[in-house]
């Protein structure tokens, strides 16, 4: 099946802001470069977006103590580069179409734990939102530029 005929995976993404309006990013364990991303993941069958968002956030970061500031109305998507199609998601999808949420972290940093059942991140940090496009893999850069506009509407 040609790449363009593969469906998009339905997912969620989570923008987690701390009290200084910095954004949580994690360093993926399967990417050896110095690339960081915000938590994201797939929506399970029968699951709504908010439930999926909360589940993914706990699965990846152990973060439970959040307040939803905004459910972004637009669905954003990205396509995988050709060298990753067929490898990621067992070759079933060509990219991901995501519902994003902007949240406020109400807890303390020591509540963040990456040593979860199926760890995806090996490190994490808080960064300034304007640095997001510089830390993400190239094929998600346009997505992160759009998300930066959404973040700026909330924190300005």
Give residue spans per PLM region.
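Conserved N-terminal beta-strand and adjoining loop/helix that marks the start
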Residues: 2-23
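Unchanged
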Residues: 44-138
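Charged phosphate-binding loop/patch that engages nucleotide di/tri-phosphates or the phosphate backbone
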Residues: 129-156
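A conserved beta-turn-beta hairpin within the catalytic core of GNAT-like acetyltransferases
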Residues: 31-34
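A short gly/proline-enriched turn/hairpin at secondary-structure junctions
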Residues: 37-38
